[in-house]
């Protein structure tokens, strides 16, 4: 660790001191992060999930945080949240910092050659920009270098940035201006189905004035953004049935119904060519944007043309609206379709069934159960008998079109007023640290933030730090070093909110 002369430190602002600290500690920060990313973090893998939780708790204890503990839900066999706190003498306001340490399930065979989701690798740039692997131990680190690994951006980066922000303040003898509580969830990527149990059982412990969420990417323009809402989320799995056994497509083609064709037509009936969802009543419950939100949207930098070029998209679904406008509407997306084999596994058959996974994103006003109901009614309107089980022989002979619909859990969207006084202080602090900040009414992604208001009566806002091209939820997930290091600075600035 480099010790700076006291007269130099005295001339620097607290944020500048933090930035300098991060620069001198980059190697140590990355060494710790490499250890963290090496622990598998799929929510269903409880032994490794608990290893992650124990690692975080140990980091918090090393920072001398108070009341460090694991908060388990009432339901057994479910990931814990990791909690700790720092009480600041004389502080009158309490911020609760949130990130999640679990990650999406992985298929390591889909990752690029040389990469493994739980063997983090350092590259000189993004893979698509020609990045090459290098050792973690370096004498200096360039801002465009990237770490590849599951959770590198979503959302172990959030955990690391928050912890290192406090470490930087502590190392420089800088006192936070607010009371701070830290809450790191372990079930977010599995739907946070039991988060409410933890919140309900620990209402006094989790009392605060504002939740500050670290999850998601910065704006596609590269600017820091602060987000005042998130979309809700729920899923449906739809299975359409054909013959009871696979049939030879030559012997039975033009005669036996093909479930792949049936499912394709059913899915196509749900959206028109402009991307509008045709499910009856899909948009009826949407709460209109406020005047303040419309004003903020008008100031969001336009990135559509650049993104189309980056992603190789000639035409977006609805050219009349921007991406910023589109994510403020509910959506229906097909996550995946399974019918029969393709490529070397292709066979001349009429398959027995076809399955689609449907993702519904919600905005304020939508109820996730009602939104599911609307889709099910649409399926029925297309002539399908809807069941929740495999069809019986009697049902197969009675109904020509059968769809089995399995509903997942879900959660509603959430918004905090863009005029909230404490949120405005966060905006001022981050703007001072990072310059121009994009203010966004809603994040395109989803987080179960409505439960914080429902059970704790405390509003949340989101301060993302990951690069927009981080491949979260997919193979080759990564974090750009500049985003990680500046994320530490950003969260340190929030911890220094004026009283």
Q: What do the predicted segments below correspond to?
A:
Residues 36, 42-44, 75-77, 90-91, ...:
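Solvent-exposed loop/turn segments at secondary-structure junctions
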